[in-house]
Amino acid sequence: IIFRYMQSDMYNLYPSIGAVNAERGNKNFEILPSSIPNTFGSCAMKISGNKAEPPQASRGVIARTYKYMAYAYPDYFRMSPRQARLMDAWDKSYPVQKWECERAKKIQALQGNENPFVSTHCKR
């Protein structure tokens, strides 16, 4: 039943291109060598072996989502120390954007909880 909560948690739901999402699957996020081309043409997503590198514009959002999921579901969503360090780095390197704050307010009103990894930056 917890998986259903995780699966339907609005902080974990984003529109995505089905083929990209399916190919990424549960691969770990990494920074891949620049010699690896984009996997989906003009979409700046790279996938190589069991690793995936998202576009720069998505990294902060991904980081805050992963950090939230680990915080909200600690017994079910775990990151390796390496993934946690990468998510911390992306969170710092790619600041919260205005649209994230607006989205978080709407989700909090509907879902009844906040994503502290977004909301703390919105209150500043």
Model feature map: region roles:
Residues I1-R124:
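Domain-level detector of nuclease and nuclease-like folds
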